[in-house]
Amino acid sequence: MLEVSIIPFEEKYAKQFYNLNVEWLEKYFYVEPYDQKVLSSPKTYIIDKGGFIFFATYNNEIVGTVALINQQQFYELSKMAVSPKYHGLKIGQKLIDYCIQFGKEKKWDSITLYSNRKLVPAINLYKKVGFVGSTPILGSAVP
């Protein structure tokens, strides 16, 4: 069985970041103008502002992504998407686990995320890895 690897952002992966996120947004919500801007220029809107983007690879293919966005007072786990044909391989959990470990290594106090209550499988995953609910956000201390 092939392993899932987590790799950092490189400009050559910007299109996959866009495609994975747009696919997810179109399935559950819609792509807002601000989303379009951020997803089209992730280096400008995330990396250059002190954030991080990671990708999950499986069988030498980019199959998932996640961003840690610098919100000045905290880091926000955001823009997480996994290609539907790779659901069930726990790639989302691997991306989140990687981000939590990354935050620990950086000695961050916490990572925050925002989610929609209708995304029940995602909410369950967030709780499973230690995020705690509040209204309207889920947040987690980095243990």
Language model: regions and residue ranges:
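Conserved glycine-rich acetyl-CoA-binding loop
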Residues: E61, M80-D97, K106, R117-N124, ...
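Conserved GNAT acetyl-CoA-binding A-motif
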Residues: G103-S115
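Acetyl-CoA-dependent GNAT
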Residues: V4, P8-K79, S83-K85, I96-Y98, ...
